[in-house]
Amino acid sequence: MSKKYDLVIVGAGPGGAMAAKTAGENGLKTAILERKTNPAEITRGCAMMFAVESDYYFAERMYYNEKNKKMIFPVNGFTVDYDGPTRNFYAWHIYAPNGKARLPLGNYEENIKRGDEGRLSLVYDKGKLLEGLLKDAVKNGVEMFTGVNVDGVERTEKGGVKVTGGGDTFEGTFVIGADGTGSRVAEFMGFNKERTFYGAAPGITYYVTGLDIPQSEAVITANCFKPDTRYPTFFWIIPSPYGMDEYWFAMPAQEDFEYITRESPFSDWFRDVKVIRKKSLVTSMWSPVAEPYKDNVLLVGDSAWYFEAEITGSMMCGRRAANAITVALRDNKPHREGVLSYIEWWKKSFPEFDDYRHMMMFFPFRFMFSEEEMNYLLSLFKKPLRATLNPFLVGRVIQESLAPMLSQVQEEMPSLVEKLKVLEIDAIEQVVLDLKTSGYLNERPGLPFG
């Protein structure tokens, strides 16, 4: 027999947890379903960056107020309590394969002197954040069901939505799909039929200590050219919120760890490295949905977007969707018109805010240049560029800085000029699709941004 609710939420990550908290506070009879037994335990690799403080992101000017321990979303008009550990970082440095040349996004030396005012952003404990959101949800009457693998979502004859999983059936007037980039809700409800699938990006992440890196409080990314391999590998190093000597260290595959730490030009950074814990991840990449609504199912966060909507973007979606559903039920409009405010907000804040294809620049940038070309290219940047963590902007910031140097590049390394033409918005989608066809996204995949 079905358990009946105003709202059934699938997924207890940032989007689902925020939707549950909001719905509970609004007095909706709500159930949240989660496949993990402990939703606040982070079992998937995640950098846990606050994305982003440096710019408008998804039409929001978000930031963390460390004085009152709140994440602030002033455009959308809400805050989120967070009193767990944090750690600032002050720049993003992209290193060349030789380990010497680098492209600095932000003046690390100057920014670190300014403390909180100079930070590019910060990292925090995602598990602590989820724990607080879900505690508030349950306190306000939300029923949480863990260990539930959803195996069906469909519209009922009476206009509601039925969700099945773990031998149980849950029926809601509305359903929110908050189950990530590989959303089962999106698949079951047919959202993906009109989307383009760009590939799946697996990765391996480590929390490590004992590093000796040039910029200890910065995000560092680098390419490495392993001998006798088809594609270069790469890595991310990001400060960890759990200790000043701890870092998040991510790469495409487990076999890259030994090469990067023992044989690469960066090996001196890792002479005393110690692995504390290890996590894996897989992120599916789809073009965004045309509309995050179908038959009383609303998608939030990663499930509707390309790659990842970040923790922050997912929370914004969850809150907006739950409030829209509340209004729809109060107005006795349990249909699309009732939740039109969420649909319109999502379109304005996500696909209309910026072209998602700008976020695709990371993938070809990592593979399309030879080792010699990459070393040369990154040696051209003599001064720090604009400080940004925004994946929509970073490609454009680099292109704008390169523009005055193209005549020099044409003379000194003409092969680069032709390759740089690929990094244009109208060409990039086909490049990524070609990478999927070639097997690149399986062999040398990308990693989530935050």
Please describe what each predicted stretch is.
Residues 3-32:
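N-terminal Rossmann-like FAD-binding beta1-loop-alpha1 element of flavoenzymes
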Residues 22, 35-99:
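N-terminal FAD cofactor-binding segment of flavoenzymes
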Residues 251-280, 289-291, 298, 330-349:
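Flavin-binding catalytic cores
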Residues 279-306, 351, 355, 365-371:
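FAD-binding beta-loop-beta segment adjacent to the flavin cofactor pocket
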Residues 290, 323-374:
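Active-site-proximal substrate-binding core of FAD-dependent oxidoreductases
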